[in-house]
Amino acid sequence: MIELHQKRLSAPKTYKIPRKVSKWVVKPSPGPHNKEAIPLLVLVRDFLELADTGREARRIISAGEILVDGVVRKDYKFPVGLFDVVTIPKLEKSYRILFDEKGRYIPKEVEDADLKLYKITNKTLVRGGKVQLNLFDGTNILGSNDYKTKDSILLRIPEKEVVDHLKFEEGALVMITGGTHAGEIGRIKSYKIVRSSAPNLVTVEGEERDITTIEDYVFVVGKKDSDKPVIDLGV
């Protein structure tokens, strides 16, 4: 049997929701991001506090009042995750999904709602010999061999127009997106290729200490010659 809900106490640690209010929380539909994505209903009710109940949240969502990355989403289970931009036109407000100090997802109000940063996780050849870039949230766009896996690209949404290209290289500004250091920002100090089935390792130079983590947890957010991320990270 397919589980439509999951127990609130067993919800992913990225859910910043009360654990002892009620027994069940909505389970996200298959779609963008991974199992730690937030269902849109939970975001509207528990994070943005636009509704007191699930029924009220579903009504808001089904009325088309919530946009994710510039597109109206009416599925209350639609998965929302890192760097997604959630817009409420009636309130003239937009939020980017980021991390709080404990590595949990939190919506932070931003002005650059027309921009989203993507990590390139793979490249494939499609019909006509064109290169398709496979991005971290399941998005696919056509690109070129100038783009490498682990690089990031800045897109204008919802058009998916490329605005900038951020290379995965020493000195690049990065955010750690998994593990105990999720949400911390630093610069790539070194990159170690592991000659085994184990993941490659990246050492990130932080403000107070160096952090070594796996490459999957490293997301380029700024260029090596810049002191600022290319999007508003609320820091």
UniProtKB/Swiss-Prot annotation:
The keyword Disulfide bond is assigned to this record: no
Gene Ontology MF terms in the entry: rRNA binding; structural constituent of ribosome
InterPro entries referenced in this protein's UniProt entry, alphabetically: KOW, Rib_uL2_dom2, Ribosomal_eS4, Ribosomal_eS4_central_region, Ribosomal_eS4_central_sf, Ribosomal_eS4_KOW, Ribosomal_eS4_N, Ribosomal_eS4_N_CS
GO cellular component: cytosolic small ribosomal subunit
Family annotation (Pfam families): Ribosomal_S4e (PF00900), RS4NT (PF08071), S4 (PF01479)
GO biological process: translation
Keyword entries, A-Z: Ribonucleoprotein, Ribosomal protein, RNA-binding, rRNA-binding
Residues annotated as domain S4 RNA-binding: 38-101
Cited PROSITE patterns: RIBOSOMAL_S4E, S4
HAMAP family: Ribosomal_eS4
PANTHER family: 30S/40S RIBOSOMAL PROTEIN S4, SMALL RIBOSOMAL SUBUNIT PROTEIN ES4
Entry's family note: Belongs to the eukaryotic ribosomal protein eS4 family.
Name listed for the protein in its UniProt record: Small ribosomal subunit protein eS4
Biological source species: Archaeoglobus fulgidus (strain ATCC 49558 / DSM 4304 / JCM 9628 / NBRC 100126 / VC-16)
